[in-house]
Amino acid sequence: MWAKDAQGRWRDRFDATEWGGPFTEGSSWHWTWSVLHDPEGLSQLMGGHASMAARLDSMFTAPNTYNYGTYGFVIHEIAEMVALDMGQYAHGNQPVQHAIYLYDYIGRPWKTQQHVREVMGKLYNSGSKGYCGDEDNGQTSAWYVFSAMGFYPVCPGVPEYAMGSPLFPKLTLHLPHGKNFIVKAEGNSPANCYIGKALLNGSEFT
């Protein structure tokens, strides 16, 4: 994502690792994925599903270098991204936390499942420093709770959920009017995190 100035002109200099300026607490690496309402449209702008997948892949493998830009110093979100050592993926701050689930929209759900499990296992724990960054209105813990259940609301306000990789063999959500939503993950284990087939009320779900 390349920013424009106040007159609607493209900025004359682009550095994908530059924080600040047009990007709040992040860089182009993070805000490029903020088309939560239209992942398919984003993929077409990027040249299709394969091209978008390659860009997502590169976020996790690129050097975790940075330019602190208009901030003028290394803010804690930058320091956390470097410490997490997952390329340019900065789970310690909220703007990019949904990006892992975008693989679902471009036909590569196993990559969502892989990265979701990696983040839950590597960046969260029950100790005094159990969060990998700031919490900001409960988003970082909400990401974990949804991901542990096996699904995630990529676009706020839309009653749709992207599928991840449930952490538990079985969990039950108690819904209004005495109803339950039960998630069963047969054969679930840290090494067996990929979903071979999903059923919803007995019918195959994709």
Predicted regions and their residues:
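Active-site core of glycosidic bond-cleaving carbohydrate-active enzymes
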Residues: 1-182, 187
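C-terminal beta-sandwich/jelly-roll accessory domains of carbohydrate-active enzymes
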Residues: 187-206
